Amino acid sequence: MASIQRVAGFDIGTNSLRVLIADVDSLSRIVAGLRLGFAVRLGEGLSETGRVSETALERTSRVLGKSTLLARRLGTSRMLTGATHALRVATNSAEVVNDLEEAAGLPINILTPEEEAYYIYTGALSDSFFTALPNAFPGASPGTSPVAPPPASPGGVASTGAGATVGERAFEGGFVIDVGGGSTTLIEGSGTGIVRSSTLPLGCVTLTERFLKHDPPASEELRALGDHIMTELSRAQSLPLSQVRPLLLPEAQVPVTGVGGAVTSIAAVSLGLPYYESRRVEGHILTRDEIEHCAQQLSRLPLEEREKIGTLGRRRAEIAVAGAFILSLLTCHLNVRRVTVSTRGLRYGLALEAAAHPAG
């Protein structure tokens, strides 16, 4: 019987705080877990002021404190945090980290873009022999809920979708896209790890605040948003997209996996779900046409109508248009015809890293 340790990963993003409390066996498989997501919007107003606001910090500190308390109550042996774009660029990052560390009672790690890419990659393509933790989660803030695990496929192995390890079959290469609140990460990988990656300043929160001032967005705002996205895509240096594009041609058969709240939200909208179900979203294949249709559909709706889409909710509805435009233009630019959606990502990679270095 493989030994089990309970660990936790905390993804402190520009839009969301995502938590995974997981049981990991000696083969680095996540065998049970509790997933939580909170739209704390740490980066609210950051693109305009360059600072994390007091309101956003208080909101994030409160939720992070409750989440780490929950993890301790559930008996985690080690917890690992990873903060991304917002804390990399905020001018008051040091004081924000101090406050978050006081609330959480553990170190806050500001990840470099390379570290973020590594944890996204290992998390998105991780083994997922996954069942829900039986424990309730007392003390969580209103609006918090556990997310159901992926459905089991024949033989008891959780369905992982293209690009993931399934049973004894090793992942042999692929491409991962993470559209986040403050940045978009592109990762080219092989069976032995990351070949190269690039983090672009294209985030749902930052682009919404910068370009989309009207409700619904004006046509000139959408054009400016699209032009900006295409300009940034053409500037990618560490992962030149002109070199990536041939890898993604249909004959190359390189799997493309999409992670992050923007991608999973688009999948849920495309599926027409009345409410978000990770069981349905996990492994769903989004075509380029579906993504473009979703972007156009959302851009025509006022916020009040977007909020009525059960899979979005108010906070995601506010930034859904920018997220859909980023993914749509990225897939067009790279000639990607389909994206397999993964509900895993950075928090999974952090949890696996915590398990790999247990407390002494």
Label each region the model flagged.
Residues 1-38:
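Early-domain small/polar-rich strand-loop-helix modules and first-structured segments
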Residues 11-13, 116, 178:
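Acidic active-site catalytic centers that drive phospho-/nucleotidyl reactions
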Residues 34-42, 202-204:
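Short, small-residue-rich loop/turn micro-motifs
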Residues 138, 142, 146, 150-153, ...:
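Low-complexity, Ser/Pro/Gly/Ala/Val-rich intrinsically disordered tracts
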Residues 173-187:
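A generic, well-ordered mixed alpha/beta core segment in the N-terminal half of proteins
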